[in-house]
Structure formats: structure tokens, C-alpha cells
Amino acid sequence: MNKQEEENYNSSSYYYFFLDKMIHNIKFRAFVYEGEDIGEISQAILNILPEAEIEAEEAEGLMEDKIIILSGVISKKRYTKAFFNKLLELDTDKLNTDLERKIDNKGNWFLRFSKNDAFNEKWTIIDSGDSIHLKIKIAAYPARKEIAIDKIRVVFN
């Protein structure tokens, strides 16, 4: 990105236009294991993505235990923009540092939020464990890792 493009990105009106076009969609998924409350896990998802329409699907685990998979997609721009604005309130230095390993070659950004913290209305990004999985499709043309990373870093800076 050249100096002029960066100046344009940082100007207020262009910044909001840019942010509005930043994300194509957000796919989410969480597993509800035996002993967990489906209502609590659904609420945890809604605390991160308030407009989510959650679908439930039953599955069977490795030990033949019952698992419910909660999933869905957020595509409306006002909702993806609201999510990204809230994400900017988190530790953007850490998010920025993790971009290389959390974005795939097609421009998908993978984040995981703690289910327990999300239920308590706290956004905690984690690398493993019991979590809400997000797959965020960054609007990068062409859809490549480097372009997606550059777009996100412009907003972080």
C-alpha cells in the first residue's frame, strides 16, 4: 500500500466506508457437550454476535456422547461492522501479532472466544480449549492472505 492510499484509509469518512466493506461474513460455531446448558452457550454466542440466528444440529462424539453444534452466518454489513468496531476495543497489538497465523491463504480470519467469558459478556480471545469459533471472511481482492492482513493492519494502525 502506498503512502497516498494509507492517508486515504486514515481519513475519517474513508475509514468508515472502508470498515463497512471490510468483512463479507462471519461464520460461527460452538459445541455443546453433555452436561452443558444449550441456553447458556446460545447466550454466549449472542453476547458476541447479538444478531445471530443460531441453528442447532445433533452429532455424536468419539465416545458416542451426544454433542449439539450451534452455528450460523452473519452477513449484514451493519452487524459485521458493529462486530469489528467492538473487536477494535480489544488488545489490537495482540490481534495484529497473531494475524499471520490466524488468516488462511483465502483471506479467512479465524478467531476463538472463550465460551465461559462470552457468557459473562467478556470477550476473551483464546488459542485452544472450549470456545466459540469464528471464521471471518475478509473482503480482499484477490482473496489472498497478504491482502487480507494489509487491510486489517490499516484499521489497527
Where in the sequence are the language-model features?
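Long, hydrophobic N-terminal alpha-helical segment
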Residues: N2, Y9, Y14-E55
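Beta-strand elements of well-folded, non-transmembrane domains
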Residues: A30-E34, L49, K76-R78, K115-F119, ...
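Short, charge-patterned binding micro-sites
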Residues: E55-Y79
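Mid-chain, well-packed structural core segment of small domains
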Residues: K86-E121
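Glycine-rich, aromatic-bearing surface loops/beta-hairpins
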Residues: F113-N157
